[in-house]
Swiss-Prot record:
Keyword tags: Chaperone, Host cytoplasm, Host nucleus, Virion, Virion tegument
Biased composition (Acidic residues): 43-79, 89-102
Entry protein name: Tegument protein BKRF4
Interaction with host histones H3/H4: annotated span: 63-64
The family this protein is said to belong to: Belongs to the lymphocryptovirus BKRF4 family.
Residue ranges of the region described as Disordered: 1-217
Biased amino acid composition, Pro residues: 136-145
Subunit structure: Forms a complex with the host H3/H4 dimer and histone chaperone ASF1. Also forms a complex with host H2A/H2B dimer. Interacts (via C-terminus) with BGLF2; this interaction is important for infectious virion production.
Role, per record: Histone-binding protein that binds to histones H2A/H2B, H3/H4 and cellular chromatin to overcome the host DNA damage response triggered by the viral genome ends. Interferes with histone ubiquitination and recruitment of repair proteins.
GO cellular component, one term: host cell nucleus
Domain notes: Binds directly to histones through its N-terminal domain.
Annotated compartments: Virion tegument; Host nucleus; Host cytoplasm, Host perinuclear region
Length: 217
């Protein structure tokens, strides 16, 4: 009896684990499909051409199973079949006006669907996003620290080159030429006759070597 209860408890634990694994897989798949649908709806410009507002991937699988049971071949409802009409499709019941009216409600329903699934899957795995990851800006270089100290002195002017004074003589001012009267001619030489005559008149006659004759000595 104890072995039977033990085996039954082990089976119930296994069933619980399998159920929890299946729930996790379904929540991940639903969050993945909802995330892909949300990113596709943001990227699509014309919503009226490609929007399937109230249908998800799981609903389409259920509809396909209802239309085509496992015994029948789904290829029978192809374009070559004359009995097939577009009224049999899922999208034929919706007109363009219905799609336009359903777009805000569908977005609200998607947001309501996404929020609990994301809350469930937040503890397990993050939902994949198709948008590019934001690249972080490179860090700015640090600002240069202010230098505390005296201001640098202005550069000195170059020293004058010494010039030799011997090579260059300073320019002297030119003196003006003063032109006066012509110099006088010297007098002509006097004749010896006149000289002798003059001496004879001024000097007494010398007669012998007497003291009287040389009074000036």
């Amino acid at each position: 009896m104890a072995m039977f209860l033990k085996s039954r408890g082990v089976r119930s634990c296994r069933d619980r684990r399998l159920l929890s694994d299946e729930e996790e897989e379904t929540s991940q798949s639903s969050s993945y499909t909802l995330g892909s649908q949300a990113s596709q709806s943001i990227q699509e410009e014309d919503v009226s051409d490609t929007d399937e507002s109230d249908y998800s991937d799981e609903d389409e699988e259920i509809d396909l199973e209802e239309e085509y049971p496992s015994d029948e071949d789904p290829s029978e409802g192809s374009d070559s079949d004359p009995s097939w009409h577009p009224s049999d499709s899922d999208e034929s019941d919706y007109s363009e006006s219905d799609e336009d009216e359903a777009t805000p409600g569908s977005q609200a329903s998607r947001s309501s669907r996404v929020s609990p699934s994301t809350q469930q899957s937040s503890g397990l795995t993050p939902t994949p996003s198709f948008s590019r990851p934001r690249t972080r800006a490179p860090p700015r270089p640090p600002a240069p620290a202010p230098v505390r100290g005296r201001a640098s002195a202005p550069p000195r002017p170059p020293a004058p080159v010494p010039q030799s004074t011997k090579d260059k003589v300073p320019n002297r001012p030119t003196r003006p030429v003063l032109r006066g009267p012509a110099p006088r001619r010297p007098p002509p030489p006097s004749s010896p006759n006149t000289y002798n005559k003059h001496m004879m008149e001024t000097t007494p006659p010398i007669k012998g070597n007497n003291n009287y004759n040389w009074p000036w000595l």
